[in-house]
Amino acid sequence: MSHNTLPTVAELSGEMRERLATVKYVFTDLDATMLAPGSCVLRDNDGNPSTKLVEAVVALARAGIQVVPTSGRNRTMIHEDARVLGLNSYIGEMGGLVMYDLKANDWEYLTGDMPYDPSCGLTPHQVIEQTGVCEKILARWPHKIEYHNDMSTGYKYREVTVGMRGDVPDDEVQAILDEAGCGLIWACNGHLTHLSKPTT
């Protein structure tokens, strides 16, 4: 059995079979997990044509198991991923945006320790931008860090998080965030393997 193949329920016995029979949700990342390189649904990791992902999603749906993609992607991107795959829920922006029911448009922002009042008329992202903390980080490390906008066309809009990319000392950035008093956490959402062009 390869490292990425799980046994089927029929191959299991006893307690493990009973435990797996109670699974109702599969939470999974997208890139290099559900999707092949290049965010492709119909290819395998070697680039060969494959329907394995589609077959797995269909089999899980038939078993009554809901697949919930989770990603750092913004709403527009992950919404389309979920819609095309026939999924009804997703978690975007590193946990900051939860779509409970896509068909009913039932969603909410999760902002952790960041004080946020939805009645302010701004998104959490806009509230963060208004503090000036992002500009402070960019000014502290010129040419070392920049906004990471979604897609190579420079689509910037995010609702909860601020995407940045570069090589800066994590502890110093976190200190700047702590000083701003916004309850923000500096987190890594992975390493980029390809940059098509600067997006700032």
How does the language model describe each region?
Residues 20-23, 64, 87, 157-159:
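A general structural motif
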Residues 1-30, 34-35:
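Non-catalytic pre-domain segments flanking phosphatase-related domains
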Residues 29, 37, 70-73:
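Acidic/polar N-terminal loop/beta-strand segments that form early-domain functional surfaces
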Residues 48-152:
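Active-site phosphate-binding/coordination module
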Residues 40-47:
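Short glycine-enriched, charge-decorated loop/helix-capping segments at active-site entrances
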Residues 34-38, 100:
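Short acidic/His/Gly/Ser-rich catalytic and metal-binding motifs that mark active-site loops
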Residues 132-200:
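Conserved acidic, metal-coordinating active-site core of Asp-based
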